[in-house]
Amino acid sequence: GLWSKIKETGKEAAKAAGKAALNKIAEAV
């Protein structure tokens, strides 16, 4: 249903945010 869609979207967003954070850390090093 709608709730599982929201949860999936949140998971994808969290993954993307995590990757972006790792990239920023890698650039800073």
UniProtKB/Swiss-Prot annotation:
Keywords: Amidation, Amphibian defense peptide, Antibiotic, Antimicrobial, Cytolysis, Hemolysis, Secreted. The lineage of its organism: Eukaryota, Metazoa, Chordata, Craniata, Vertebrata. InterPro entries: Dermaseptin_dom. Belongs to the frog skin active peptide (FSAP) family. Dermaseptin subfamily. GO terms for cellular component: extracellular region. It comes from the Eukaryota. This is Dermaseptin-1. The modification Valine amide is found at V29. Antimicrobial peptide, active against the Gram-positive bacterium S.aureus, the Gram-negative bacteria E.coli and P.aeruginosa, and the yeasts C.albicans and P.brasiliensis. Has hemolytic activity (40% hemolysis at 128 ug/ml). It comes from Phyllomedusa tarsius. GO terms for biological process: defense response to bacterium; killing of cells of another organism. Its main location: secreted. It is found in: Secreted. Expressed by the skin glands. Coiled coil: none annotated.
